[in-house]
UniProtKB/Swiss-Prot annotation:
Coiled-coil regions, chain positions: none
Alphabetized InterPro entries for the sequence: PPE_C, PPE_dom, PPE_sf
Origin superkingdom: Bacteria
Family to which this protein belongs: Belongs to the mycobacterial PPE family.
Gene name linked to the record: PPE30
Native source species: Mycobacterium bovis (strain ATCC BAA-935 / AF2122/97)
Record GO biological process: response to host immune response
Stated name of the protein: Uncharacterized PPE family protein PPE30
One Pfam family hit: PPE-SVP
Amino acid sequence: MDFGVLPPEINSGRMYAGPGSGPMLAAAAAWDGLATELQSTAADYGSVISVLTGVWSGQSSGTMAAAAAPYVAWMSATAALAREAAAQASAAAAAYEAAFAATVPPPVVAANRAELAVLAATNIFGQNTGAIAAAEARYAEMWAQDAAAMYGYAGSSSVATQVTPFAAPPPTTNAAGLATQGVAVAQAVGASAGNARSLVSEVLEFLATAGTNYNKTVASLMNAVTGVPYASSVYNSMLGLGFAESKMVLPANDTVISTIFGMVQFQKFFNPVTPFNPDLIPKSALGAGLGLRSAISSGLGSTAPAISAGASQAGSVGGMSVPPSWAAATPAIRTVAAVFSSTGLQAVPAAAISEGSLLSQMALASVAGGALGGAAARATGGFLGGGRVTAVKKSLKDSDSPDKLRRVVAHMMEKPESVQHWHTDEDGLDDLLAELKKKPGIHAVHMAGGNKAEIAPTISESG
């Protein structure tokens, strides 16, 4: 542009009409800040790469460093270019300020033009010719000044706007990397599946040959661990002896176990502490074994010796002596089915065959023995006893009636603990009965004489 052909009004007006140097100075500051950030980032990248390559060596670390190094170099170069741009912007702002200062202010140009117009208007007789020439001379100076300022500004700004072009950042990734990664993953999956199948095949083959290779494996292991070449032979010999010993011990164990099992079952069946379970013996077997008939004409005493309850004199059951306390603590003779002449042992309630019932454990033992052995048992006088039972004496009278006896038996079955037992011989029976008539309650008199025991109940009720 030829600024010399333009009047000062245009040149000065354009120079004063713009925003000034403020935007250019702001741009210079921005470029300078960008240069600082880029330089700092490049330094950080470089330090990280140096640390990684120091502790991480290999092909991967080399590839990573090679990919990051160009980017670090680009950031450093871009930082320098940004700093150069900042300097150029600052130079452009300085050129503007210089041109602005050299330009004639528009009001001065306007005043000169106004003065010239007044002189020309009043120059009727030529008296203002000199003043008009002076005004024109000053205006020409303004023209030259503005033209010179604009030419200078154009030259300075053209130099300031010359900056090095910025380069695009280099790529840090491979465009074909995703495809390559997909192929690598597929190959890895295929190789993994093949390895898994191979491993399964090897495991199955090992399991299939484990039994046949056991001796060889153990022998090799023992020889390797002990360092003795014949350690496996010693082990196999000892193992053979162990198997042979087990073959001899097992039959003996079976015999001992069978014997102990039988003893335990026998103890459980005849244990006087554990309540007897009547379900273990069929009712038909009990009835057939005892041989109870409707008449109940004979007692168990004919097949077993009497139980003696004398002081310091042990009782006996067959050839076995029993403690004297058995007769008092668990009497072997208790009324159970005296008046039920039409029934056998099946009529005895199941609940009565337990400890504290009319049949004690001792009596139940004899019942079980009779059932299993098939020995005949007899009861006389309507009472079941371990010795011979005699008829109730005539002096009892009403007590011998069936109704009365049934009531007494029912009471004894409900409350067997209320029965009072008395022991005497035949000579002292009359005196004992006379004494018991005066005492209330239910009394059972046990008679003992020689090898027999006679028992007669007496019932005395108050009221």
